[in-house]
Amino acid sequence: MKTTFLDFEQPIAELEAKIEELRFVQDDSAVDISEEIERLSKKSQQLTKDLYANLSPWQVSQIARHPQRPYTLDYVAELFTDFHELHGDRAYADDVSIVGGLARFGGHPCMVIGHQKGRDTKERAARNFGMPRPEGYRKAERLMRLAEKFGLPIFTFVDTPGAYPGIGAEERGQSEAIGRNLYVMAELKTPIITTVIGEGGSGGALAIAVGDTVMMLQFSTYSVISPEGCASILWKSAAKAPEAAEALGLTAHRLKALGLIDKIINEPLGGAHRDPKGMAALLRRALADSLRQFQGMSIDALRERRFERLMAYGKFKETTPGA
């Protein structure tokens, strides 16, 4: 698949286009231009390194939404075996913007749950652009309860712009469904390992992200509102999204510094979409390390640790000026 370049990546795109042009010429010519191709390839790689070493929060937001970025089912295919998807909330419908099911990770039975966006127009519409309705969150709750019943660790993958705010979703109890998931996950008697793989949009993300460990991919985001939404409220213009992204502190490094996440998983050069298999290998290692950390822990110790972790959120210290 041809790589889609973002607007700030245009210098890289121009170099890559030149490299492709030279490769085409070399195939149809007896002239050896392999050295020039190699030189330009190294130049492109260095340019990518330099560019990605100094990304703004808004640019990170763009990468997190990249249309070729791996989604939950892509990681399921790479990391898990014997995946059997489970459907429906047993109350209203099956919301396919959240997928989940039984699987094996490194031979260990587990439950996998995650947001799922679409690749083309038809699939995006079917999956509601990764914005779950209440039945999606209730399906997730059902699968979590099932995992608890059989003592299976839960892996959740977060990638959503937010919960769907439609009238029907609100009428069917969107806020109640999200709130219940927060309550359920806080007390589940089984390990929960959460990874933000793309967008972590507000309560829609948090509803499957109350974990014993929360990790983020290097170029993913996690915030209470999108930069555009924040800009529209504060500046009355979505054009101020870059400033809003800066103010929101939505990057993995910022959230790690605040103690809101536990680990950052580095991405391949140019982002996860440039090397999905390489990203999957890095993610596999991080998930295995996290699972190993909790496997020998008693249920009581696990829940106590989770409670203390949640209670540590939002703590601050007041000081007297001049003291």
UniProtKB/Swiss-Prot annotation:
| Locations listed in the record | Cytoplasm
EC number(s) on file: 2.1.3.15
Which BP terms in the Gene Ontology apply to this protein?
fatty acid biosynthetic process; malonyl-CoA biosynthetic process
Give the matching Pfam families. ACCA (PF03255)
Under the heading SUPFAM superfamilies, the entry gives: ClpP/crotonase (SSF52096)
What is one cellular component GO term in this UniProt entry?
acetyl-CoA carboxylase complex
Gene3D superfamilies, per database record: 2-enoyl-CoA Hydratase, Chain A, domain 1
Q: Which UniProt keywords apply?
A: ATP-binding, Cytoplasm, Fatty acid biosynthesis, Fatty acid metabolism, Lipid biosynthesis, Lipid metabolism, Nucleotide-binding, Transferase
Tell me the protein family, please. Answer: Belongs to the AccA family.
Job description of the protein: Component of the acetyl coenzyme A carboxylase (ACC) complex. First, biotin carboxylase catalyzes the carboxylation of biotin on its carrier protein (BCCP) and then the CO(2) group is transferred by the carboxyltransferase to acetyl-CoA to form malonyl-CoA.
Listed under subunit, the entry gives: Acetyl-CoA carboxylase is a heterohexamer composed of biotin carboxyl carrier protein (AccB), biotin carboxylase (AccC) and two subunits each of ACCase subunit alpha (AccA) and ACCase subunit beta (AccD).
Task: Write down what this protein is called.
Answer: Acetyl-coenzyme A carboxylase carboxyl transferase subunit alpha
Tell me which species this is from.
Burkholderia vietnamiensis (strain G4 / LMG 22486)
Classification from the root reads: Bacteria, Pseudomonadati, Pseudomonadota, Betaproteobacteria, Burkholderiales
